[in-house]
UniProtKB/Swiss-Prot annotation:
Protein name: Transcription antitermination protein NusB
The entry's keywords: RNA-binding, Transcription, Transcription antitermination, Transcription regulation
Keyword Transcription part of the UniProt annotation: yes
Annotated family: Belongs to the NusB family.
Function summary: Involved in transcription antitermination. Required for transcription of ribosomal RNA (rRNA) genes. Binds specifically to the boxA antiterminator sequence of the ribosomal RNA (rrn) operons.
Organism the protein comes from: Synechocystis sp. (strain ATCC 27184 / PCC 6803 / Kazusa)
Keyword Mitochondrion: no
Highest taxon listed in the record's lineage: Bacteria
Gene field: nusB
Gene Ontology annotations of biological process type: DNA-templated transcription termination; transcription antitermination
Amino acid sequence: MLARQQPRRVARELSLLSLSQLSRKDTKPETLEQGDLEALLLAATRTLSGEVHEILETASAELSRSHERLLNSEIRASNLNSAKAMLEEAMTLTETVINRLALAVDLPETLQLAGQMEVRKFALELIGTVCRRRQQIDEQLQEAMVDWQLSRLAKIDQDILRLAIAELDYLGVPQKVAINEAVELAKRYSGQDGHRFINGVLRRVTEKKTDGAPVTPGEPR
């Protein structure tokens, strides 16, 4: 049985997708009004809706390729080794299809939750906090990164970090929860090792808050 998604986790995902829209606009984050935030949230919801169709189309194409490999293993394979290789490729493609479909099954619930007042309220609060406190948040992140530059990170990684700091400093979310949720967002939207980097940066931020000790230069743990 599929686990039910948490409303706040959906709100975080919507917030991240909303912030990604800002990079495509000339509007400065700190000048956004409530109507602008609502429009960003609507665009994020539509992005999720389009993702369902894209996932299903990709899964369908991969399933067709898997079927083709199975046929080739029976008809064209010249020996046992080549047949085995084709079967393994077909199995890998099928596994990928199953994983994609599992994600597609979750998305309708995400879209349903996105329309709930509780989810929208927290998402708007998150987006608004990041926009209003952008300078303070970025300064804190840059200090924790030391000889790394926040501006050189992928935009999606910057926004994941900003959301986490907004939760930690301004919304009263416990450290462990804020960091874990940021890591989960990174696993889905960041690069291959993005979640480890983000975890390291946020750990440094919280350690610095706790003991006030200077941060040692180098890559975040």
